[in-house]
């Protein structure tokens, strides 16, 4: 026991000794660890699938330096469902202080939490498992490519889960389920979705033209691609056109057209025109099958400064005034349609025009109703007009509103009447037929022309357009009418006092004379048509087209009176003819320019308007564009099928044809289907008067009355008549050897234009017209026609 006590005492002494010493050893410093998340948090994946990115943490000491060799422990803190797993329960940190683990989501959708920890510190990851990962097509669907070649676009799908969240890490299997030929394949057959949920594969088409279907499958979800091989099929027919040759294709042939191999510089013009029975928009896509390259930008025209060659002189613009006029005309034609049987009956029961001698005399005063005009629509207008006879000729009686006395001098009124006798009536009756008196006609054998400020008052602001004059069908023997073949025309208003807008200097006497002569020629056709027209002649589009033709052919007659002997159908008038003299300019301003302005609007945007068959433009512009198209179509048919000396027989036949619709009437009179004519007229517009063609086009794709490009390209005329200042039709541009497409949402009987040009040698090209979006064949009810002209 003594030794035990001695030993204990010795130990105590020893401890005391070392405890009191100044240079003895110290305890090692304590290290504090901090763990933080680096990446992998907030991931989303499909149930049962490993997350695409590992869960990564970093361990640092109290100085912020990475700590290597430290063990990080991993554990599942919470789970939405069973069977989730970690690749390891512990991992050491590397030299960068980082440690990672992979995590596979469980079998239920929801939140999973994984806890990472080291001594004294921890961090928790929260990730999401989403149900199924539903597939949808992202891109590549509906494309067209060459048989045996790789598709220009990859086939891309996207997997999304609950709430539309992308699902990465999902295996997607791609399979060709249909092919028109052998050898169709996808590569890779299995692809994994990336962080954006997308997976893709590349398709090689089979060796034959036709549809190809590819299905993508993942986790029981499917997505289907429908694409088409067109072009490069050695066993299929090839549309081999030489420069100058053309073809008009319709029906099932539009599913795929093969063009041959081409050298650099080969060129085609392609014009697509839908001609269904129903009026409406028709959504289609023209697909070009070529090599894999992006589509070039669409070519568009550039505007040019307008010249001073204008109806209203320098600094003023012709194009606006006709808007209200055209809108009012359309309303009157719609009012007229149900009255036409009675109008014709009244014309038959009345006296023959021109045979009765009794007529109003100079100085006679009469009261007129302001027919067809309501104060509800035109609140500033009168209900009745008192007017005095100021001029009488063989065929015209001119009245002047007593409130507008002195609008013109007596000599000027006589000139107006003589112009009607010598120019307007002879031409209009030759082309469209003779009018008839109505029972109780106030001017038997003559036309009444009433100048009244009431017409001015139908407009509130001249600068926004105005109504120059009109013919009211109620005057042809109906209650509320005046029992006369008559026209209402505005009067000069140089100070603008007759409208609330007070627009001075627009309606000068000179301008009104220019406008009203043209208006009478236009409205006289409507009057004649109402009395003698049958069947389809009542349709607004063809009725208005004929009235615009009246402006033109009366202009020819006016030119002849002025000694302009070349102003006649078939003479291919060009800019130099229009600008040859002051007399020519006056004729062009008065009679021709309106039609060229209207057509210029149409050519500037043919795919953005209505053209043939329609009563009004659904996209606005007060029917400027469609009226230009209507006139051009009629002039084209007269040039193609008529003789300059006898073309009037065709217009008369068109007015009196008994067909119940205009399509059939056109077919009956011209002997070619309306649809074929409409497609070829549209093609004519893109090749007419071109001097850069590689070969002459057929005569039916040309006009004989005008050199259209020459007229528009002249800055003095194009500066007014064209929105671009020159030739306005600018087709979209695509490359023959490049896979691309062009969407077309076209109104019935309206066209879309595209130029196809080879910028490199090509082994062949395919053209397919298809439904937009689905890539399916176009619905046959749309009745599309495709005119193709090889230009180089």
What residue ranges belong to the model's regions?
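Solvent-exposed, conformationally flexible loop/turn segments
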Residues: 46-50, 96, 146-150, 196, ...
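Zymogen propeptides/activation segments of proteases
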Residues: 234-411, 415-419, 423, 427-430, ...
């Amino acid at each position: 026991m003594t030794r035990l006590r001695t030993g204990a005492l010795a130990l105590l002494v020893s401890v005391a000794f070392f405890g009191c010493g100044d240079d003895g050893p110290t305890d090692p410093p304590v290290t504090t660890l901090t763990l933080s998340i680096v990446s992998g948090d907030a991931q989303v994946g499909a149930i049962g699938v490993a997350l695409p990115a590992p869960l990564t943490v970093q361990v640092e000491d109290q100085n912020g330096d990475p700590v290597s060799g430290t063990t990080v422990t991993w554990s599942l803190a919470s789970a939405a469902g069973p069977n989730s797993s970690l690749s390891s329960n512990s991992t050491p940190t590397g030299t960068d202080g980082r440690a990672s683990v992979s995590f596979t989501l469980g079998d239920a959708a929801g939140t999973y939490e994984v806890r990472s920890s080291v001594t004294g510190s921890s961090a928790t990851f929260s990730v999401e498992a989403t149900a199924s990962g539903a597939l949808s097509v992202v891109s590549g669907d509906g494309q067209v490519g060459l048989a045996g070649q790789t598709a220009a676009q990859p086939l891309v799908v996207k997997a999304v889960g609950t709430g539309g969240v992308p699902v990465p890490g999902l295996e997607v299997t791609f399979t060709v389920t249909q092919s028109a030929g052998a050898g169709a394949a996808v590569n890779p057959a299995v692809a994994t979705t990336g962080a954006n949920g997308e997976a893709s594969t590349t398709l090689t088409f089979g060796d034959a033209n036709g549809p190809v279907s590819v299905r993508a499958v993942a986790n029981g979800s499917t997505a289907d691609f429908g694409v088409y091989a067109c072009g490069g099929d050695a066993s299929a027919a090839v549309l081999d056109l030489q420069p100058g040759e053309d073809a008009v294709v319709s029906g099932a042939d539009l599913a795929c057209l093969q063009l041959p191999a081409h050298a650099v510089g080969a060129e085609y013009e392609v014009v697509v025109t839908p001609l269904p029975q129903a009026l409406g928009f028709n959504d289609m896509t023209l697909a070009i099958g070529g090599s894999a390259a992006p589509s070039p930008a669409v070519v568009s025209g550039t505007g040019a400064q307008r010249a001073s060659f204008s109806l209203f002189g320098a600094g003023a613009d012709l194009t606006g005034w006709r808007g209200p006029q055209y809108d009012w005309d359309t309303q009157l034609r719609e009012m007229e349609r149900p009255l036409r049987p009675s109008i014709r009956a009244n014309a038959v029961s009345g006296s023959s025009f021109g045979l009765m001698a009794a007529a109003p005399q100079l100085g006679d005063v009469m009261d007129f109703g302001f027919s067809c005009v309501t104060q509800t629509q035109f609140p500033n207008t009168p209900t009745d007009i008192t007017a005095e006879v100021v001029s009488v000729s063989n065929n015209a009686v001119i009245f002047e509103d007593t409130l507008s006395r002195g609008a013109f001098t007596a000599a000027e009124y006589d000139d107006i009447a003589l112009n009607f006798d010598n120019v307007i009536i002879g031409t209009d009756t030759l082309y469209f037929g003779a009018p008839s008196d109505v029972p109780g006609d106030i001017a038997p054998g003559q036309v009444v022309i009433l100048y009244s400020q009431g017409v001015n008052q139908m407009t509130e602001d001249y600068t926004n357009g105005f109504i120059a004059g009109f013919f009211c069908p109620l005057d042809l023997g109906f209650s509320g009418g005046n029992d006369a073949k008559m026209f209402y025309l505005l009067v000069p208003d140089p100070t603008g006092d007759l409208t609330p807008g007070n627009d001075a200097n627009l309606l000068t006497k000179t301008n009104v004379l220019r406008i009203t002569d043209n208006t009478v020629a236009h409205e006289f056709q409507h009057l004649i048509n109402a009395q003698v027209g049958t069947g389809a002649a009542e349709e607004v589009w063809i009725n208005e087209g004929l009235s615009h033709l009246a402006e033109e052919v009366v202009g020819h007659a006016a030119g002849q009176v002025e000694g302009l002997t070349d102003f006649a159908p078939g003479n291919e008038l060009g800019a130099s003819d229009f600008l040859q003299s002051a007399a020519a300019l006056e004729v062009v301003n008065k009679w021709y320019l309106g039609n060229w302005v209207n057509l210029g609007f149409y050519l500037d945007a043919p795919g953005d308007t209505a053209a043939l068959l329609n009563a009004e433009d659904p996209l606005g512009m007060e029917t400027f564009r469609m009226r230009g198209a209507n006139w051009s179509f009629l002039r084209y048919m007269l040039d193609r099928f008529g003789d300059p000396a006898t073309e009037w027989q065709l217009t008369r036949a068109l007015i009196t044809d008994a067909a119940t619709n205009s399509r059939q009437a056109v077919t009956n009179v011209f002997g070619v289907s309306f649809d074929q004519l409409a497609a070829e007229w549209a093609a004519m517009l893109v090749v007419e008067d071109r001097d850069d063609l590689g070969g002459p086009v057929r005569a039916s794709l040309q006009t004989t009355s005008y050199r259209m490009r020459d007229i528009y390209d002249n800055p003095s005329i194009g500066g007014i008549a064209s929105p671009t200042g020159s030739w306005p039709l600018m087709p979209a541009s695509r490359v023959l050897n490049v896979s691309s497409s062009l969407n077309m949402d076209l109104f019935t009987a309206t066209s879309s234009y595209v130029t196809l040009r080879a910028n490199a040698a090509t082994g062949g090209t395919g053209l397919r017209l298809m439904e937009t979006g689905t890539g399916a064949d176009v619905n046959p009810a749309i009745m599309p026609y495709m005119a193709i002209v090889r230009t180089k």
